[in-house]
Amino acid sequence: MNRTLQPDSGASQTAPTAHQARAFAPASVANVAVGFDLLGYPMDQVGDTVTVRRIDTPQVRIAAIRGIAQPLPLQTERNTAGAALLSMHRDLALPFGFELEIDKGIPLSSGMGGSAASCVAALLAANALLDEPLRREHLYRYALDGEAVASGSRHGDNLGPLFLGGLVLCTLERLVPVTVPTAWHSLLVHPDTLLETRRAREVLKEPYLLPDIVTQSANLALVLAGCYHSDAELVRAGLRDVLIEPRRAPLIAGFTAAQQAALQADAMGASISGAGPSVFAWFQTRSAAEAAAPAVRAAFTAAGFDSQAWVTPLTSPGARLL
């Protein structure tokens, strides 16, 4: 599948067609066990919607935040969507401004890329209102600035998939689509509890041993090779996290049981989605992923949490204008 960074369809290349635009950006799974801050893919059954209006005053302001993720800051500089638009506004020295309304569909501190979704949706909508809309690769730079507000660091593993769709390798300089068989599906289970990204990053401060880094590098290589060659056994051999998961798993009640339930249901691999507490698992078919969901959810029920589950292809689409 050819996925490239292009100007948004529906956005004029010469003049804005309106003074208001809306965009949707889905949830995403980041890290993917072997690619900390590098790999991610969308889960398009749930997401955030952002409405942006072009205003005469050269400023960026947030008019409202609605939906399931509350409370979130209305201060522009402290909000990922607001910070991303500020970065764009300052870089382009725009003579006009933006007012945005955010409708949150992604739970707060869920490991499902909620901060990235608001950020990318805001940028896509604002981009449609520029006199000369930018390519998405240009927007990615602003999105990195916005994401840093939520986690304290610039990383693109939740952002890249929303710009390109599908599994994406994300460095700070470029986004690289990774070919994945269309039959492969992801199960994502979100327990009804919170784990703040900053707290999840705190446990990673101690240095890692070189042999563990080598093992993780080999696992990443196996997963990427397995994707490109449509070889599920290569993915099975590599889709395990020896660096991040051992430190974060103790923060997530029920994680180990949930992971084992997925693996016993013939998952190619299962681990923490983003910073957690959500858990993802890869399967070779949709039916296998759907069949595994009840057992994974039961593990969180036993730990005292309600949960939600979604199944989507690993080739799911990213963000889009509405």
Curated annotation (Swiss-Prot):
Pathway listed: Amino-acid biosynthesis; L-threonine biosynthesis; L-threonine from L-aspartate: step 4/5
Keywords: Amino-acid biosynthesis, ATP-binding, Cytoplasm, Kinase, Nucleotide-binding, Threonine biosynthesis, Transferase
Gene Ontology molecular function: any one: homoserine kinase activity
GO biological process annotation, one example: threonine biosynthetic process
EC number from the UniProt entry: 2.7.1.39
Signal peptide boundaries: none
Role this protein plays: Catalyzes the ATP-dependent phosphorylation of L-homoserine to L-homoserine phosphate.
Name used for this protein in its record: Homoserine kinase
Gene that encodes the chain: thrB
